[in-house]
């Protein structure tokens, strides 16, 4: 589900990886959908948002609409994809938000992070890279190598001379290596802002000044605080690590149930029993 902001490299990586894992792959451009929605908005509010606007609300809205369209399309494809090829059944939508993105809210509410289940939702970006490295060593998939070496980017802003101008780490203000350390101090370390700052002064004493560490702690906790509302609609993730954003004590939102055939059989027996008594 590419757009005019998608780089050639990303599109090539997607195709190559699909070939490597023997998966069906199709390319769909969302630009016409984005334009149609924006025109409807313009009719009602007499405003056409632009990336060149000095109002950050416009640039954020333009990015968010792309992300949310991808969520809608993903569910449509999951529901009708097999029907289009004359096959029975339906598909599940998989989420793509990792631990670091979830903790700092670097995702759009109800975007492509919204899904039926998130297989990487409890794993950090650094550990995901390590996992991909392990797979690459075993399989030597060319598309995977390019993905591992690529700079993380949402690709929701216009390209500059055909190249990506937007990067995750620049927008977050923290590197994924830093987020991996901070995330573990939060959980399972159980540290709040002050305890985290004190600990990082020890861990990063040879890398940053205390003022720089203070700024990084402030950035993380500010993002964590203002974006925590997004966690209320986060897609259930597989519990793979102890630093997951989820509560591991129990699942407050159970959604995997047995078929209840035993209970239904007992109900049917009770119905027959009651009928006989009458």
Where are these regions (language model features)?
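ATP/NTP-dependent adenylation/nucleotidyl-transfer catalytic domains that generate, transfer
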Residues: 1-278
């Amino acid at each position: 589900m590419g757009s005019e902001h998608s780089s050639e490299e990303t599109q090539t990586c997607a195709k190559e990886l699909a070939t490597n894992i023997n998966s069906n792959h199709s390319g769909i451009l969302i630009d016409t959908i984005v334009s149609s929605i924006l025109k409807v908005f313009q009719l009602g509010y007499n405003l056409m948002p632009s990336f060149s606007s000095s109002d950050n609300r416009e640039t954020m809205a333009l990015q968010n609409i792309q992300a949310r369209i991808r969520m809608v399309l993903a569910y449509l494809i999951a529901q009708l994809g097999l029907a289009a090829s004359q096959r029975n059944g339906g598909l599940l939508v998989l989420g793509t938000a990792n631990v670091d993105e979830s903790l700092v809210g670097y995702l759009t509410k109800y975007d492509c992070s919204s899904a039926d289940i998130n297989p990487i939702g409890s794993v950090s970006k650094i550990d995901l890279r390590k996992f991909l490295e392990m797979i690459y060593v075993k399989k030597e998939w060319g598309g995977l190598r390019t993905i591992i070496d690529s700079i993380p980017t949402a690709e929701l802003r216009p390209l500059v001379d055909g190249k990506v101008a937007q990067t995750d780490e620049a927008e977050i203000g923290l590197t994924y290596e830093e987020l991996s350390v901070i995330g573990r101090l939060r959980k399972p370390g159980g540290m709040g802002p002050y305890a985290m700052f004190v600990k990082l002064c020890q861990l990063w004493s040879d890398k940053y000044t205390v003022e720089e560490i203070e700024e990084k702690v402030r950035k993380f906790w500010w993002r964590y605080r203002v974006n925590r509302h997004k966690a209320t609609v986060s897609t259930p993730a597989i519990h793979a690590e102890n630093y997951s954003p989820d509560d591991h004590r129990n699942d407050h939102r159970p959604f995997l149930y047995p078929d209840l055939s035993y209970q239904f059989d007992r109900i049917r027996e009770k119905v027959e029993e009651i009928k006989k008594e009458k």
